[in-house]
Regions:
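A short helix-loop-beta submotif of the ANL/AMP-binding
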Residues: 60, 72-73, 79-103, 107, ...
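Flexible, non-catalytic linker and terminal segments flanking ANL/adenylate-forming cores
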Residues: 1-20
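Conserved AMP-binding A3 loop
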Residues: 48-51, 178, 187-211
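Conserved AMP-binding/adenylate-forming core of the ANL superfamily
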Residues: 19, 24, 28, 36-81, ...
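Conserved AMP-binding/adenylation subdomain of ANL enzymes
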Residues: 210-227, 235-275, 288-291
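Conserved pre-ATP/AMP-binding loop-to-beta segment of ANL
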Residues: 35, 147, 161-162, 169-191, ...
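Structural core segment of the AMP-binding/adenylate-forming
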Residues: 26, 65-66, 93-169
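Adenylate-forming
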Residues: 79, 124-133, 151, 232, ...
Length: 296
């Protein structure tokens, strides 16, 4: 094709000079370059990047087997556990959009979001079974419910058709996941909390998520392979994009179910934490923690 601009002649986009911006590329690269580096720490769980990558692929495959694909919404009602991190990759790897629900909301609000976002699948932790059960009774949509059984979770009712680990096992680690065809395709759907009226939906696209993730690195002057403590909820603006940021840096995600001083101080010492996030109230809680909590 000939153009009036000489710099555009025979320079159309192709696989050699262009790829869509997406945080999914971060996981693929990190698993290839640092397969044996620790990716996730949670209780007694230790997984490297290759293992984590394969689990994300199997999640994408399992969702695809349910008929989930581009434009479908997959919701999660999860604390900061490994499954929440995996959902940030596995859900968009099958073309779907992740809706991370605020675990502090009431059943009526959760029901509204499930309906408004048209969720086809819901990943949920048994700690929130009372709220989720009521929400499912209130909402018009009937998502497929998958229980995430975390060994550190308190008691609760299992509500789903299947359990998360069994669901993953139904997937294929050789599943041919693909980048988005357009970097403006949606990767996640978030909702406002604490506003007047009903929650308002906010869409992230792959391009924006990738750029913000990289922006986190430059803003913090982050060094290679950080050790990040999950004190910030992943449901809060997708954890400010740090699920993707830490992955891009080949770092280690140290999961934390509850943001409490004792476990935070313990994790900082035990896992040599280099970075963490938190609202001022979280930092104030740490500053004002008891001597016993600080020594935990």
């Amino acid at each position: 094709m000939t153009s009036s601009n000489k710099y555009e002649d025979n320079l159309e986009k192709n696989s050699a000079n262009y790829t869509e911006l997406t945080p999914l590329s971060f996981l693929e690269r990190t698993a290839r370059v640092f397969p044996d580096h620790t990716a996730v720490i949670h209780g007694s769980i230790r997984r490297n990047w290759l293992e984590t990558y394969k689990r994300c692929i199997k999640l994408a495959s399992s969702l695809s087997n349910l008929g989930i694909g581009k434009g479908d919404t997959v919701a999660m009602m999860l604390p900061n556990v490994p499954a929440a991190l995996e959902a940030h990759f596995g859900v968009p790897m099958c073309g779907a959009v992740l809706n991370a629900l605020n675990i502090r909301l009431d059943a009526k609000t959760i029901a509204f979001i499930l309906d408004h976002g048209e969720s086809k699948v819901l990943l949920t932790d048994k700690e929130f079974s009372n709220t989720v059960k009521e929400a499912l009774n209130l909402c018009k949509s009937k998502p497929i419910v998958i229980d995430v059984q975390d060994s550190l979770a308190p008691e609760g009712e299992l509500l789903g058709e299947t359990e998360y680990e069994s669901f993953l096992e139904s997937g294929d680690e050789d599943f041919g996941w693909q980048y988005p065809k357009d970097e403006w395709d949606a990767i996640s759907l978030n909702y406002t909390s604490g506003t007047t009226g009903n929650p308002k939906g906010v869409v992230y696209h792959h391009r924006g998520a990738a750029l913000n993730s990289i922006g986190n690195i430059t803003t913090w002057g982050m060094q290679h392979q950080p050790r990040y403590l999950w004190t910030l909820p992943m449901f809060h603006c997708n954890g400010w994009c740090f699920p993707w940021t830490i992955t891009a840096m080949g770092g280690t995600h140290v999961c934390l179910r509850k943001t409490e001083p004792g476990p935070i101080f313990q994790a900082i010492l035990e896992h040599n934490i280099t970075h963490m996030c938190g609202a001022p109230i979280v930092m104030g809680m740490l500053v004002n923690a008891s001597s016993k909590e600080k020594k935990s």
